[in-house]
């Protein structure tokens, strides 16, 4: 589940594609460009709505004989749109709780939003509360702790910053092919640490 960072690409060079190619996983990319964790109304493009849509389908075959893992990556559109960190947290919590109730044995990994060049390197204030991208990263980590799921701080692992990020981003926001590969590998390593 995620936004355009995961959803803009659906081939082997996508982040889920990298994960599938380097492991025995069978990824299902449920990310949607322009989506957020924040839910404004039922049936919108938010994470809670995406989870409800997913749970309403026939997913019995997904976990047959396999370990089910949900990778969640939201936050950039919440920040860009100016949704509050509080509403972002509520959306993440609602989606994660629904997945936990439906699949209590599944592994859940929340991946933080990646470093960006736009919006003054994520330091521009897009709402009346002066919240910056780092606040959404911290909120994602807090939700992971509260829900007792795993968390990957993409910024800490990848070490993208103002000096090197242009080499990993295609448009100041979305990872390029190398960036997607590196993020996919980071997710694999994070899952390997928690999976038997």
Go through each PLM region and give its residues.
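N-terminal cationic-hydrophobic initiation segments that often serve targeting/anchoring roles
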Residues: 20, 62, 96, 100-101, ...
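Catalytic His-Asp segment of secreted/periplasmic serine-dependent ester chemistry enzymes
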Residues: 114-196
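Structural beta-sheet core signal
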Residues: 72, 109-111
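Generic structural signal for well-ordered alpha-helices
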Residues: 92-96, 137
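A short helix->loop->beta-strand "cap" motif at the edges of active sites that frequently abuts
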Residues: 103-107
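Conserved SGNH/GDSL esterase-like catalytic core that processes O-acyl groups on lipids
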Residues: 5-93
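Short hydrophobic segments within beta-strands
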Residues: 1-2, 111
């Amino acid at each position: 589940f995620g936004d355009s960072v995961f959803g803009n690409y659906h081939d082997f060079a996508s982040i889920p594609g990298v994960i599938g190619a380097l492991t025995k996983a069978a990824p299902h990319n449920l990310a949607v460009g322009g989506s957020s964790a924040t839910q404004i109304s039922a049936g919108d493009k938010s994470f809670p709505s995406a989870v409800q849509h997913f749970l309403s389908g026939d997913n019995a075959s997904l976990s047959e004989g396999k370990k089910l893992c949900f990778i969640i990556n939201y936050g950039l559109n919440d920040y860009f749109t100016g949704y509050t960190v509080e509403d972002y947290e509520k959306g993440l919590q609602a989606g994660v709780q629904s997945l936990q109730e439906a699949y209590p044995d599944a592994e859940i990994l929340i991946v933080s939003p990646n470093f960006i060049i736009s919006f003054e390197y994520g330091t521009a204030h897009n709402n009346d509360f002066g919240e910056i991208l780092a606040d959404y990263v911290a909120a994602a980590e807090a939700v992971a702790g509260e829900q007792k799921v795993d968390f990957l701080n993409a910024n800490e692992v990848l070490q993208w910053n103002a000096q090197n990020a242009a080499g990993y981003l295609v448009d100041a926001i979305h990872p390029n092919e190398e960036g997607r590969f590196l993020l996919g590998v980071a997710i694999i390593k994070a899952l390997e640490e928690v999976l038997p």
